[in-house]
UniProtKB/Swiss-Prot annotation:
SMART domains linked to this entry: EFh
Additional notes on this entry: Binds three calcium ions.
Lineage top rank: taxon: Eukaryota
N-myristoyl glycine lipid sites: G2
A molecular-function term among this protein's GO annotations: calcium ion binding
One Pfam short name: EF-hand_7
Record's protein name: Neuronal calcium sensor 1
Length: 191
């Protein structure tokens, strides 16, 4: 699905409706827009970055967009096909908190080893700070990516092993609403 400008088959629409929080009608509408913007049925990383630039014109979203792109690109072929796009969009826009946090964990776990290290988190947080630019006024204790990451690790890394498991990440994010709010910074595409 996605190679070339093919129409979605009704069986594919049905499957996507079962796999996502979108109705068949919504999937058809999203598909129409996807094919309009990506006539070959593939969204490249450069195209993805361009979309983020529209949402964050005051900052530099290119690094963050690249990180998000890698999570959307499930089969790691260097392009986002419609089914990958709609599944990720479903989780980030309509998923429950656990689903969103699991998705966010995959975003932060850059090497996909099942843990978030301080450096991985710093890469993501730094890219978020670059993306939002000066549009968001941050409190003194979080006005640099390093301070933010230190605060998150102090709160989440319960066993002090300098890495976060999925469980530590979920528990910490649920305990601190500001972290869940910060996670929503990357939902510009779906809001």
């Amino acid at each position: 699905m996605g190679k070339g400008n093919s129409k979605l088959k009704s069986s594919q629409i049905r499957d996507l409706a079962e796999q996502t929080y979108f109705t068949e009608k919504e999937i058809k509408q999203w598909y129409k827009g996807f094919v309009r913007d990506c006539p070959n049925g593939m969204l490249t990383e450069a195209g993805f970055q361009k979309i983020y630039k529209q949402f964050f014109p005051q900052g530099d979203p290119s690094d963050f967009a690249s990180f998000v792109f890698k999570v959307f690109d499930e089969n790691k072929d260097g392009a986002i096909e419609f089914h990958e796009f709609i599944r990720a969009l479903s989780i980030t826009s309509r998923g429950n908190l656990d689903e969103k946090l699991h998705w966010a964990f995959k975003l932060y776990d850059l090497d996909q080893d099942g843990f978030i290290t301080r450096n991985e988190m710093l890469s993501i947080v730094d890219s978020i700070y670059k993306m939002v630019g000066s549009s968001v006024q941050l409190p003194e204790e979080e006005n640099t990516p390093e301070k933010r990451v230190d605060r998150i690790f102090r709160m989440m890394d319960k066993n002090n092993d300098a890495q976060l498991t999925l469980e530590e990440f979920k528990e910490g994010a649920k305990a601190d609403p500001s972290i869940v709010h910060a996670l929503s910074l990357y939902e510009g595409l779906s809001s």
